[in-house]
Amino acid sequence: MNLLLLAMGLILPRRPHALHMGPGDPNFDEKLVKGKWFSVALASNEPKFIAKDTDMKFFIHKIQVTPESLQFHFHRKVRGMCVPTMMTAHKTKKKFQYTVNHSGHKTIFLEKVDPKHFVIFCAHSMKHGKETVVVTLFSRTPTVSPDVMWMFKKYCKTHGIHTSNIVDLTQTDRCLHARH
């Protein structure tokens, strides 16, 4: 019996959702992530989500916080045009965890946060038995310091994403001209 409990203790922490601790402060006020943001980096274990000409890239404009959800206001490139869109992530019973039903069920985790400078979100989705992980880095300014980018890359590595699957979005058209 003790061996079984030990085995379970070694297996359970390896589940992807067990990797999510949220912001360092358990009393962090989610309202602090509201406001204007810029997409700075994107990473995924699935290369199609970060490909150069994919329609799957979303560029953040702002985040609104309600008692029940986070509302992400994005621009998305569709055939070269910047199209505004909104996605609502509904709060769950677990702190800093949200769900989205957009192209399938996704679980989004609010991870590392410095509300005056950056925020990292990590999304997990399961389709046909395969898990996809997408990690985004948003900044209050169009770019981030090398230290923040290093921390983002380190975070991605701990979630099984190779550095070749991390894209610096500051070198792409992020639909900045379409922001209001």
Swiss-Prot record:
Q: In which tissues is it expressed?
A: Expressed in glandular and lumenal epithelia of the endometrium. Is transferred to the embryonic capsule, the conceptus and the yolk sac.
Coiled-coil intervals: none
* Highest taxon in the source lineage: Eukaryota
A single Gene Ontology MF term assigned here is: small molecule binding
Q: Name where it's found.
A: Secreted
* Disulphide bonds in the chain: C82-C175
Name of the protein: Uterocalin
State the organism named in the record: Equus caballus (Horse)
